[in-house]
Amino acid sequence: MAAAAVDSAMEVVPALAEEAAPEVAGLSCLVNLPGEVLEYILCCGSLTAADIGRVSSTCRRLRELCQSSGKVWKEQFRVRWPSLMKHYSPTDYVNWLEEYKVRQKAGLEARKIVASFSKRFFSEHVPCNGFSDIENLEGPEIFFEDELVCILNMEGRKALTWKYYAKKILYYLRQQKILNNLKAFLQQPDDYESYLEGAVYIDQYCNPLSDISLKDIQAQIDSIVELVCKTLRGINSRHPSLAFKAGESSMIVEIELQSQVLDAMNYVLYDQLKFQGNRMDYYNALNLYMHQVLIRRTGIPISMSLLYLTIARQLGVPLEPVNFPSHFLLRWCQGAEGATLDIFDYIYIDAFGKGKQLTVKECEYLIGQHVTAALYGVVNVKKVLQRMVGNLLSLGKREGIDQSYQLLRDSLDLYLAMYPDQVQLLLLQARLYFHLGIWPEKVLDILQHIQTLDPGQHGAVGYLVQHTLEHIERKKEEVGVEVKLRSDEKHRDVCYSIGLIMKHKRYGYNCVIYGWDPTCMMGHEWIRNMNVHSLPHGHHQPFYNVLVEDGSCRYAAQENLEYNVEPQEISHPDVGRYFSEFTGTHYIPNAELEIRYPEDLEFVYETVQNIYSAKKENIDE
């Protein structure tokens, strides 16, 4: 069935006839127009690919104008998929008709896979091997990514399940590509000092759905460099940095000339552009992402230092990164070239503190403690990235218990890409996956690796192995889908249905119901910890699985819920897993959820009619 759909869709682009049909009466006026005019008409944007295919079959002249590598099919491709044009060079020879067909086929294949995910993975997190279908597809990866982006950009509140799985697939594909790029980057020799490139890989990995590129970030930095040069020209119109061409630089030797650059930088960054250290919201991951530092013009010491360092080096000032405890710094050499230097031959720059220049003693005052000379030394790219990822790791551990721990998962991936044998972090990763109930097979692989690296971890490893194997066995024992019918006598007390927008009477949060039980199905410990016995109806009442607007999933007693008289969308990341559409008053379950609650939708319609229609009538009166 799916294959037939693909074949049918491919017929949208008719094959060009080997022999053009004889000229048809009425075409003579058209074909006698100058070629440029005909080409303009065919590229006007009103004609579809099918139209072009049919036009090209009418006569030899039109067929030649619609040749595969010409402007007509290029325009068809551009109009249909404009975001892909940046991947083509104006000098490249491209068979645009063939490119159109390949892109169309890739899109159909991508949609077929996205459509299959809900049925395959509704009851569990998408496993590690769940993305193998996408990885094994033939054709350019950018075409599949582009189709996924098209799905995510579909307008309106429909296709929520498609968007949910398209987002997961795109997230995975981009992260895999970025991680491979980062690993290749880390194999560069030690003298390869592109700190910005490494920082951008970290930014991209943690934000794979954002359009972040080194080229764009470098362009923004280049624009800052231009402003610095403008200021520098007012200080010293003959300054050698002004002669540097874009993308080229060399180091300036004279300290006075270097000082002029730093003065101009400080004026532009902190006075003109108003960059500043983020003291008010220091523990925010956005402070570590370079694209956000440039947008928000704020960051923490390490991200501000990397920006400052990049600009200074482009203008010929050889600053170096210093992995100073609690406060990342840059150092600026004041000694003669080739001389034996110690820590007192440097000035230390605090990019977080508006480019303030510090002595060794002032650095100690900055953090309130004495440190050894070794901590004033320069560090390589890998150590800088290690500190950035370490900061993200610390922030990830702060995430609330109801969150997906995505930042912690991403930062663990990045850290272990740099240091794959860190036993404690491997153990943390295994525990995290175990806690989230995802990827049990991967958990076993991690635990086996830990046991090989450090047999002394046998106790912790053994505990996790045992419980992970039990989890796998329970999954194997799971029978078919449990169907809950509202008409069943044991469900007579259930008042609400999946898809309804509710409000918690006590805590005031908004939520949507995605499941229910006739009585509380949690264990005794949970019931005791949540003080369920203090409720008037205790645990002998229906309980509802709800997605809450703060991103959490909760289990709420019926007596604590009420209809939300002002229903609104619930901005929960898992809404698309259960629902296909938001109507403005309620959510419509997707096919998989409806199988489990086949009678709920009819009840939802009745409830919406009674609650919201009555409200509208009262307002009209």
Swiss-Prot record:
Q: What does this protein do?
A: Substrate-recognition component of the SCF (SKP1-CUL1-F-box protein)-type E3 ubiquitin ligase complex.
List the keywords (alphabetical): Ubl conjugation pathway
Task: Write down the PANTHER family for this protein, in alphabetical order.
Answer: F-BOX ONLY PROTEIN 21, SI:DKEY-261L7.2
Key word Chloroplast present in the record? no
Q: SMART domains attached here?
A: YccV-like
Q: How does it assemble?
A: Interacts with SKP1 and CUL1.
Alphabetized GO MF terms = DNA binding
Q: CDD domains, per this entry?
A: F-box_FBXO21
Question: What is this protein called in UniProt?
Answer: F-box only protein 21
Q: Does the keyword S-adenosyl-L-methionine apply?
A: no
Q: Which SUPFAM superfamilies does the record cross-reference, listed alphabetically?
A: F-box domain (SSF81383), YccV-like (SSF141255)
